[in-house]
Amino acid sequence: MKAIRANIPRALPTGARLVCADNTGARELEIIAVKGYKGVRRRYPAAGVGDIVVVTVKKGTPEIRKQVHYAVIVRQRKEYRRPDGTRVKFEDNAAVITNERGEPRGSEIRGAVAREAAERFSKIGTIASVIV
């Protein structure tokens, strides 16, 4: 896991619903915790692109539903600025189910993946179809 060069806003608080962008059988995820988050008093933990979050599956196949998993956020609607000055935003909030080290459980990723997430987690970058 490498550091991210862009300063990404943490736009997804706990309780946010995400689209699952892989083929593990999950369709909708809910963030219940953010791994490594150290906040200020009474602030909700929040995450952005490239963060590892703890999620529960709200919609999907019965085998994967109602369980707690790790996931990496690969897209967010809130725009962020890259060091070269370009601004990036996606049309949905999406994550990929992984293990605690950031290795994906699925074998394919649907849709675009942010370059920051692909650089930080190389296994996600190798199975991504499009990197933006």
Swiss-Prot record:
The keyword Ribosomal protein applies. The keyword Coiled coil does not apply. Signal peptide: none annotated. Part of the 50S ribosomal subunit. Forms a cluster with proteins L3 and L24e, part of which may contact the 16S rRNA in 2 intersubunit bridges. Binds to 23S rRNA. Forms part of two intersubunit bridges in the 70S ribosome. Coiled coil: none annotated. One of its GO terms (biological process) is translation. InterPro entries: Ribosomal_uL14, Ribosomal_uL14_arc, Ribosomal_uL14_CS, Ribosomal_uL14_sf. SMART domains: Ribosomal_L14. GO terms for cellular component: cytosolic large ribosomal subunit. Belongs to the universal ribosomal protein uL14 family. This is Large ribosomal subunit protein uL14. Keywords: Ribonucleoprotein, Ribosomal protein, RNA-binding, rRNA-binding.
